Amino acid sequence: MKKILTILALTLALAAPALAQNTTQKINKKNLVIKEWNTEPRSGKKVLDHVTTFDADGKKIEEIEYGSEGQKWRKRFEYGADGKCVKEMVYNDRNKLETVKKYEYNEFGRKKTQYNYNAKGKLLTIKVFEYIAEDA
């Protein structure tokens, strides 16, 4: 029994730093910019692939996707007083507005309706979200 307890204590002592490291690796997203890079295998050249920007509250406010020729698209996000995303604007490679998505939420804070508009404000489609929970 003493052997088992000793082995268990040693195992926990060795695993503790790894467990602590996992908990400290959580990223604080406040005022954070995440840049993703691709590296070309032959030349070793780094190419910017994606940039995500968060505001002081940790909310994602912008995403930009890049290709070899530069920016492919850009998305901007706006939030309501409750912290939920209420508007998403998508811009093309020339930073020209292409589409706008507006969101409504249900009483549980889940997306209820998504309205999709073109750049001129014309309603294109409406997406309704349905949540079905089955009891186990």
Which residues does each PLM region occupy?
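Sec/Tat signal peptide C-region and signal peptidase I cleavage site
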Residues: 16-20
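Bacterial N-terminal signal peptides
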Residues: 7-15
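Buried hydrophobic residues that stabilize the cores of well-folded domains
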Residues: 21-136
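Positively charged n-region of N-terminal signal peptides that target proteins for export
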Residues: 1-7, 21
